[in-house]
């Protein structure tokens, strides 16, 4: 089993003892991303749309570092603090995929790191 740690400056550095992503054989496991701007380290959290866009951009950068894109994503997990924002999240999230949506669950949680409103993790597979 080949294991490689994926790190890019296009996504924020981890805020705890974990890696941005781990590639094992042809499967990429991406740690949950929040709305930190990788250049400034500041939160982009004016509203749920801004947060979701920044999270998706962070995920896009990690995918690219591993030679992948959103078409390689097979599973996502979305954590949100307010299920009333579900449709707004879906509107932004859906724009990053070309209609071939991965499997997914969305879970409401009481709080997230740095008091953001959304966190998304992904699993992607290199073309077979």
Label every model-predicted segment.
Residues 2-128:
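Short, polar/acidic, helix-capping and beta-turn segments at strand->helix junctions
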């Amino acid at each position: 089993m080949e294991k490689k740690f994926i790190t890019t400056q296009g996504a924020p550095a981890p805020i705890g003892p974990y890696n941005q992503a781990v590639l094992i054989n042809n499967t990429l496991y991406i740690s949950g991303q929040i709305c930190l701007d990788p250049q400034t380290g500041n939160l982009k959290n004016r509203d749920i749309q801004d947060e979701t866009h920044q999270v998706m951009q962070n995920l896009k950068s990690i995918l690219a570092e591993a030679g992948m894109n959103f078409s390689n994503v097979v599973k996502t997990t979305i954590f949100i603090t307010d299920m009333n924002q579900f449709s707004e999240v879906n509107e932004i999230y859906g724009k990053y995929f070309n209609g071939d949506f991965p499997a997914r669950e969305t879970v409401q949680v009481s709080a997230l790191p740095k008091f953001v409103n959304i966190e998304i993790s992904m699993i992607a597979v290199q073309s077979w």
